[in-house]
Regions:
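Donor-binding and catalytic core of enzymes assembling or modifying cell-surface/extracellular glycoconjugates
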Residues: 71, 75, 80-164
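Leloir-type glycosyltransferase catalytic cores
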Residues: 162-176
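Solvent-exposed, flexible loop/coil residues
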Residues: 24, 56, 124, 172-173
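Generic alpha-helical propensity signal that fires on short helical segments
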Residues: 61-63, 108, 151, 172
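Secretory-pathway luminal glycosyltransferase catalytic domains
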Residues: 1-85
Length: 176
């Protein structure tokens, strides 16, 4: 099930953050990514491809409705961030980076390729991002929610999540 309705646990946010805090010694971290994230107005984008797409095949072209809708949402969110954040740098995580570079400006984006498939490294890096463009993925939802930056901007999709859970998204997250 989904556990992304903060109304059930908001009173325990500090304790939950401490419980899920990842210790440095538990991760095999690439310091270059962390340094880039720390030294920029970092914006985390996580794209989990083909999770909710209509077809069961891995069709990565622009005709794939989920990919198209997701990319459109991210473009609009990037524009919102650019209007509200000085010199943002976008860090893109995905379960499949093979076709994403063609969609994004290489000068503004860093693609984080987790070849070792250690999600704990990605989750660890989410802690240091300053802002989030959250897709319909519980993994990134938790990464954004657990991030302790009090000034973070979290953008969430208005219509990409197939869930009928009306309180899925925190109220202070911007919907686009």
């Amino acid at each position: 099930g989904h556990y992304e309705s903060e109304k059930y646990f908001i009173d325990y946010k500090k304790e939950i953050i401490q419980f899920f805090k990842i210790k440095k010694e538990k991760v095999d971290i690439n310091n270059r990514y962390k340094k880039d994230i720390d030294n920029s107005n970092s914006v985390s984008i996580c794209i989990r491809q083909n999770r909710y797409s209509e077809g069961k095949h891995k069709d990565h072209d622009k005709s794939n409705k989920f990919t198209k809708d997701t990319i459109d949402y991210i473009y609009k969110s990037i524009e919102h961030i650019k209007k509200n954040v000085e010199k943002p740098k976008f860090f893109i995580w995905s379960n499949d980076l093979s076709n994403l570079s063609g969609y994004f400006n290489q000068d503004e984006c860093i693609f984080i390729d987790n070849k070792q498939n250690k999600s704990v490294n990605d989750f660890y890096l989410f802690n240091f991002c300053k802002h989030f463009i959250v897709g319909p993925t519980s993994f990134h939802w938790w990464g954004a929610w657990l991030n302790e930056n009090p000034n973070k901007i979290c953008i969430r999709p208005l219509n990409l999540n197939p869930s009928n859970n009306i309180d899925f998204w925190p109220e202070n997250w911007v919907s686009i």
